[in-house]
């Protein structure tokens, strides 16, 4: 008989089997290893809905009016476990939606409201999101009722929009279409600080120089959505805060007028909570005990709800009527002089020096009690900064104009990462086309594709020219905010036609051939660019002995310069493209990490990234015709030579510069090829080498071609939401 006492004595019955939480992971031992996990997020193993679930089809079954009615009713259905301020949850729901959308940054398109990521770490436990877990829990009965017909991502934004409507704002519209994720995003860089709300100059600070905020970040501190409401690093100074506000909102794709509108509109309703001590709050949701059931910041010491709630630490309302949409914010801010004080929680805030009793907001529980209104340092920035002040004065004089600007800015804020209008769904989608949506007119889908392809084939363009141009047109796609891609052919417009990475001189030469073909057949240049790339691949595959037709879906349109916000598109400029073995300059981040980031934005898997690299090298598609990484003597043949030679132990590899290596014959030291870090990582990284070995095998020459074509087609069609 075995001795079972070891279990009863408290020893772990699974011993050292599956690792659930404890133990060192590979990343702990080798922290500089390439993190390929960012390419394998949100797959079917984490999604409880299964592969067959189609959210857009489920939306067609949604009773939108009933849902909106239920949300309206929720606003005034105060719950004893988390009572509504003044009997109205409007301010709370607005803050939830604002903070969901406000994490978006234009530099890489990550963050934002498009995935329901506020439900997961780290956002669900950010200091700036204190008590938003209560808002989502208040929404749960509605989510439960409508089930699969409404995503959390859509519901969070709609709740904020309906909150405004219930308080009197005429909103600009709303679009469904945001699909939920089911675990935390691991590709988003939120900063390097080691503690929440770490001030400038702390370890891993996001600031350098005078006050230069690290790209792609928009928020000023780890754990904040935008700026510190108490002032820069917690030190009140409205003009310095105004500078932070301007940078942060610009990185959220907002101009000065939209910034003032969003600040004022967000603070027209609701209040700040700081009537108590933050020391009495429990852990954030991610660190809370099991019995808290996903709720954080619980106060088991004092009352902790209603007028005694603590969230930001600032205490008070901005306006006299915090559950009503009006122009009171500007009257309050601009009509009074303000002085600094501290809240009961010890946070810096501004209060009026003198104010009439009837202009004070009432207590959230007892309307017979009136309290001083407050302003944050960010609010005071709207008064002190000359540009913001001028805009605020105009809004004060023209309430209708303010309401319209805010409604449009709110729509932009909450839809910025939803992508093109073709992804919008629902009865309240605005008809007006907005330039920040990167509009593209519909193209022809019925025409003689074979005839167009034949004309391209007779044009004299090389395989490298056709493939490179199509790739450059499509590689701007970002799955984060659904921007970029080949549709629209913006590669022929400013600013893309002058980007260094697009080789403007070569691009102009190729477009001079393709544009007349598009005109002759009355089809889009966008289609012709992609079709030319496909043709080049077919020719290269044929040369490799594989007959294959690259799938092509006509119907792309051509954008115009007037449809293109040049400044907005500047952020899509590639600073590196490992697929074409190009770096604009040397960066602190390694070339292979830049490749990985681009692959993730393009929504490629590690296998797809691998096969595309191998194919692009042998096609001669390197930037400037460079031979770096071209491990073949048969350029223009879609062979697996890159992988065959990369994995061949007949060679040695030696560094010669920061991003350059020589590959020499082991037997005699003769130079055979040169390579970049991007090339050699496919032989160095154990996972990527495993993929490279698959494509180097003698029996996988045709598999390589077919996998390359599949990955290529995915890239060319990444922005074709009309095909889904």
From Swiss-Prot:
One Pfam family linked to the record: peroxidase
Is Ion transport there in the keyword field? no
**Where on the tree of life does the source sit, at the highest rank?**
Bacteria
Annotated crosslink Tryptophyl-tyrosyl-methioninium (Tyr-Met) (with W-98) location: 226-252
Q: Gene3D superfamilies recorded for this chain? A: 1.10.520.10, Peroxidase, domain 2
Q: Name one GO molecular function term.
A: catalase activity
**Alphabetically ordered keywords of this record:** Heme, Hydrogen peroxide, Iron, Metal-binding, Oxidoreductase, Peroxidase
Instruction: Provide a GO CC annotation, any one.
Output: cytosol
The free-text note explaining how the cofactor binds reads: Binds 1 heme b (iron(II)-protoporphyrin IX) group per dimer.
Identify which top EC class this enzyme belongs to: oxidoreductase
What PTMs does it carry?
A: Formation of the three residue Trp-Tyr-Met cross-link is important for the catalase, but not the peroxidase activity of the enzyme.
Enzyme Commission numbers on file: 1.11.1.21
Q: Which residues bind heme b?
A: 267
List this protein's GO terms for biological process.
cellular response to hydrogen peroxide; hydrogen peroxide catabolic process
Catalytic reaction annotation: H2O2 + AH2 = A + 2 H2O; 2 H2O2 = O2 + 2 H2O
Which cofactors is this protein said to need? heme b
Annotated site, Transition state stabilizer, chain positions: 95
- Record cross-link Tryptophyl-tyrosyl-methioninium (Trp-Tyr) (with M-252), residues: 98-226
Q: Enumerate the active-site residues.
A: 99 (proton acceptor)
The record's similarity note reads: Belongs to the peroxidase family. Peroxidase/catalase subfamily.
Function in brief: Bifunctional enzyme with both catalase and broad-spectrum peroxidase activity.
**NCBIfam families linked to this entry:** cat_per_HPI, PRK15061.1
Q: How does it assemble?
A: Homodimer or homotetramer.
The protein in question is named Catalase-peroxidase
Lineage of producing organism: Bacteria, Pseudomonadati, Pseudomonadota, Gammaproteobacteria, Enterobacterales
